[in-house]
UniProtKB/Swiss-Prot annotation:
Classification via PANTHER family: RHODANESE-LIKE DOMAIN-CONTAINING PROTEIN 7-RELATED (PTHR43268:SF3), THIOSULFATE SULFURTRANSFERASE/RHODANESE-LIKE DOMAIN-CONTAINING PROTEIN 2 (PTHR43268)
Keyword Oxidoreductase listed: yes
Protein name: tRNA uridine(34) hydroxylase
Alphabetical list of SMART domains matching this protein: RHOD
Similarity comment: Belongs to the TrhO family.
Active site residues per record: 184
Record's function text: Catalyzes oxygen-dependent 5-hydroxyuridine (ho5U) modification at position 34 in tRNAs.
Residues making up the signal peptide according to the UniProt record: none
SUPFAM superfamilies hit by this protein: Rhodanese/Cell cycle control phosphatase (SSF52821)
Superkingdom, taxonomy of origin: Bacteria
One Gene Ontology term of the molecular function aspect: oxidoreductase activity, acting on paired donors, with incorporation or reduction of molecular oxygen
UniProt domain Rhodanese: residue ranges: 130-224
InterPro entries, alphabetized: Rhodanese-like_dom, Rhodanese-like_dom_sf, Rhodanese_C, TrhO, TRHO_N
Length: 328
């Protein structure tokens, strides 16, 4: 059965004059053709994911390719049955990828047009995965890795991308004398991060060109050596990558059983992304810890209209009480 919706994932590092006005004009065009999605515009370039029917997405690609400096912009296309977004957002930001270098005394930000790692095709990246002398580093957030990753890839002990440079410096002895290849969803983060590694003095740095999204569509590798699913930042939440021997590697936060369903912790001050079944979400009030379960603003409790007596009853089932809440 034909799928009616196309999802476009793309980015391009290219200087954009008057980027704030560009963002406003871009939003107006997207709305005029009925496109949905999320786009970041900065002085350094553009990064977005959008969805629509065939005609709408074709109009959008033609429009982008008509813009100065974007004639060769690479769209990665998924075909889906439903829209991946409900609304259309185009926002101006200082950077399309925030590595946090200037915030953390790491000198100036990286310009990928000047410094970046060597591009690896899916076939070359697969060879790197099988090479014992090559270190493969996942540059995504922890919850993205936990849902799916390349076999043997290192999981940095970080919560978000901005923490990665410091983590690499703290673990420098593991990488400095080895070949290092990095990967991310579509390539935009790796362009900047691999450039930073080159600037740090790493001699042999590579990156998966086009990211995981391209690897999964390559007719030769067919996503092999990828385990689990790829996390995406839209209504789909995840997509398949391995078309050879797929496996589930995600584990339920509460009981460790196989799981690929993500929710945000019910505590708005925590908001951690956790994998869990609907049954365990109900059982644990969508809280990743006791403190989050008994938090006064627990969203699960509010959304389901649970009384305090009902909360106490749920907590008792898992051997907990409201004592922490009372003490706050």
């Amino acid at each position: 059965m034909a799928k009616d919706i196309r999802v476009l994932l793309y980015y391009k590092y290219v200087p954009i004059e008057n980027a704030e006005k560009f963002a406003a004009d871009h939003l107006a065009f997207c709305k005029s053709i009925g496109l949905k999605g999320r786009i970041l515009v900065a002085d350094e370039g553009i990064n977005g994911t959008v969805s629509g029917d065939y005609e709408t997405t074709q109009k959008y690609m033609d429009y982008v390719h008509s813009l100065p400096g974007m004639e060769d912009l690479w769209f990665k296309i998924d075909e889906e049955n439903e829209q991946a977004f409900k609304k259309m957002f185009v926002r101006y930001k200082k950077e399309i990828v925030h590595l946090g270098l200037e915030d953390n005394d790491f000198d100036n930000d990286i310009n990928p047009l000047e410094t970046t790692g060597a591009y690896l095709s899916p076939k070359e990246f697969k060879e790197a995965l099988l090479d014992e002398d090559t270190v493969v580093l996942d540059t995504r957030n922890d919850y993205e890795y936990d849902l799916g990753h390349f076999r043997g890839a290192i999981r940095p002990d970080i919560r978000n991308f901005r923490e990665l440079p410091q983590w690499v410096r703290d673990n420098k002895e593991k990488f400095m004398d080895k070949r290092v290849v990095v990967y991310c969803t579509g390539g935009v983060r790796c362009e900047k991060f691999s450039g930073w590694m080159v600037r740090e003095g790493y001699k042999d740095v590579g990156q998966l060109h086009g990211g995981i999204a391209t690897y999964g569509k390559d007719p030769e590798v067919q996503g092999e050596l990828w385990d689990g699913k790829m996390y995406v930042f839209d209504e789909r939440i995840s997509v398949d990558i391995n078309h050879v021997d797929p496996v589930v590697i995600g584990k339920d936060w509460f009981d460790g059983t196989p799981c690929e369903r993500y929710v945000n912790c019910g505590n708005p001050e925590c908001n951690r992304r956790i994998l869990t079944s609907e049954e365990n979400e109900d059982k644990y009030l969508r809280g990743c810890s006791h403190e989050c379960r008994v938090h006064p603003r627990n969203r699960y409790v509010a959304e389901n209209g649970l009384s305090q007596a009902e909360v106490v009853e749920r907590l008792a089932v898992i051997g907990e009480s409201l004592e922490t809440l009372v003490a706050q």
